[in-house]
Curated annotation (Swiss-Prot):
The lineage of its organism: Bacteria, Pseudomonadati, Pseudomonadota, Gammaproteobacteria, Pseudomonadales. It comes from Pseudomonas fluorescens (strain Pf0-1). This is Tryptophan synthase alpha chain. PANTHER family: TRYPTOPHAN SYNTHASE ALPHA CHAIN, CHLOROPLASTIC, TRYPTOPHAN SYNTHASE, ALPHA CHAIN. GO terms for molecular function: tryptophan synthase activity. Keywords: Amino-acid biosynthesis, Aromatic amino acid biosynthesis, Lyase, Tryptophan biosynthesis. CDD domains: Tryptophan_synthase_alpha (cd04724). Gene3D superfamilies: Aldolase class I.
Length: 270
């Protein structure tokens, strides 16, 4: 079993959802970002999504766009992001880590080289938002052949006719974007999320993680009662944006992560 499969299976046994945290690699700088990354598991993150900075993050809202700008301004690139994963793995061999981003930097790096280095560094999965299933042979298939899960995004506009195609070749978990649009947008209604999870379960046995718009422990707990995973990104990144020192950024992110984790862990306790 992959690290992702193992983690979701363990949490299912414990009857709780996973807290999936997203941060952008190199935001606000390499050392601060690495310290945050290393601190997330102890603060309660069950799965980590690490953003690969890109100049045109079209699916992301303002908070993550600015995180990309800060990271690129600090000279973060794909080579450094993979090095960050290696350094994270020196002290952590069990927390699943997923790289999230866009195809352009991977294409420039070289797909074959990227997959080989990602696997060697300890990457467990990929979310590449601009690679539809029609292009599985370009990245999804070779990644999975190397043992790296390929995680798909589904949205409220992904209808029943399209879903099987989107889920074709998916592994690890399914990431449901609960609000159509860009990341960090308003939270979806719980009724809508419940219906969406039920619909997805008719099409897949993979764990379902819900993201976009979750900012508080209370919201995280509400989603944790319905889904297998709760994804939080923009709310964490806001702490980096608003910090005036590296320590303030680290403490802000990890404090919120701990509070979110507590919300998720208590969600299904009756």
């Amino acid at each position: 079993m992959s690290r992702l499969q193992t983690r979701f299976a363990e949490l299912k046994e414990q009857n709780r959802a996973a807290l999936v945290t997203f941060v952008t690699a190199g935001d606000p700088d390499y050392d601060t970002s690495l310290a945050i990354l290393k601190g997330l598991p102890k603060a309660g993150a069950d799965v980590i999504e690490l953003g690969m900075p890109f100049t045109d993050p079209m699916a992301d809202g303002p908070a993550i766009q600015l995180a990309n700008i800060r990271a690129l301004g600090a000279k973060q690139n794909l080579t450094k992001t993979l090095q960050m994963v290696r350094e994270f793995r020196e002290g952590n061999s069990d927390t699943p880590l997923v790289l999230m981003g866009y195809f352009n930097p991977i294409h420039k790096f070289g797909v074959e080289r990227f997959i080989a280095e990602a696997k060697e560094a300890g990457v467990d999965g990929l979310i590449v938002v601009d690679m539809p299933p029609e292009h599985n042979s370009e990245l999804c298939d070779p990644a999975q052949a190397a043992g790296i899960d390929f995680i798909r995004l589904t949205t409220p506009t992904t209808d029943d006719a399209r879903l099987p195609k989107v889920l074709n070749g998916s592994s690890g978990f399914v990431y449901y974007v609960s609000v159509a649009g860009v990341t960090g947008a308003g939270a979806a209604t719980l009724e809508h999320v419940e219906e969406a999870v039920a619909r997805l379960r008719r099409h897949t046995d993979l764990p379902i993680s819900i993201g976009f718009g979750i900012r508080t422990p209370e919201q995280a707990a509400s989603i944790a009662r319905l889904a297998d995973g709760v994804v939080v990104g923009s709310a964490l990144i806001d702490h980096i944006a608003n910090a005036t020192t590296p320590d303030q950024a680290i403490d802000g992110v990890l404090s919120l992560c701990s509070a979110l984790s507590e919300g998720v862990r208590k969600a299904r306790v009756s």
